[in-house]
């Protein structure tokens, strides 16, 4: 589906170095950069109205040694991001943000990210996914502990790619 959220995510990934082509009818061709291969983007990454894109992309870049600023539309800039910033900081990632942890947020990825064990205080597929994506670039095992299950789309995708073991 070529929704605004999907287009914003594709544009963000292209700015990080991926090559993405929409071939129509929901078919996309993606040439990735590999784990640790994100490049420094030339511009701010605009996630439009997609909180999922903002949170997952912040997770993905949090363990890459690059600096990225994320923003969004007026609605997204009113939504708090602290629930994802707290665990990502444990990787060694630094953030510059306003007092209430809303977009725009500048992410300085860790040069040598450390693996983490993080217990989710409340169920959140977005926070869990951000941590898992960040963990891909941290040397060692990153673990997310859930007291109550949340959606597992990211785990299924990573397992299908043989990137994690559940």
What do the predicted segments below correspond to?
Residues 1-164:
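Structural preference for solvent-exposed beta-strand-turn elements
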